[in-house]
Amino acid sequence: WGVGRRLSEHLNKAKITNALQLADIDPQYIKRKFSVVLERTVRELRGQRCLNIEESISAKKQIVVSRSFGTRVTDLKTLKPIVSNFAVRASEKLRNEKQKCSQVSVFVRTSPFSDHMPQHRGYKTIELFTPTNDTRDILIAAKKALLPIFRSGYDYAKAGILLSRFSNETSRQFSLFKDPNEPKENSEFMKYIDQLNNYETQIYFASQNTKRWSPMKQNMTSPKYTTDWYELPKAN
């Protein structure tokens, strides 16, 4: 309950040696003599809820979607749809958190274990003029971040996308500098897309690979007992 050794010594001097005795003490006395935190502990021991659910769950600071590749990726044509898949998935997570982001970062790297191969790490962050959770905005930013960090001649082993600098999705912030050619944010449209894709992905953006995580490393995945007829468990 957050009662450490030093605090225990002070409680023992007050003849409080167990949780039952602590629960019987007047919370106001505990607040005066010790702290608000310990007073809250006393109230919780009495069965009183002191924190709302919203206070207990801290909001995420960032969302990361990344994968290691089962086969090395050497060309931008293959890498683009992979990063697009990451951007779409990260956008879905962002909307589930009821947040918007102001930064989109993309990273790529070769395998640090392949000492005999040329090594390269690339990382780029795009600042958004206005916070968004619209997949289309995040896809555009991801593409802008990927192009300058890609280098031909390297065997890439991993890539990923990171969304950060969050704000509540109900907040509104406008900018005079937003590119008019960028798609307008439409929360209802994205909500509709999420509903359609709730169980199995049915709608893809043009920049995506329809095999969502290909060519990812999937040799250690668990059998799909509930979604694939060919992987149903067999009873002898």
Language-model features: locations:
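DNA-contacting surface of Y-family translesion DNA polymerases
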Residues: 12-153, 171
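Acidic, metal-coordinating catalytic segment for phosphate/diphosphate chemistry
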Residues: 129-236
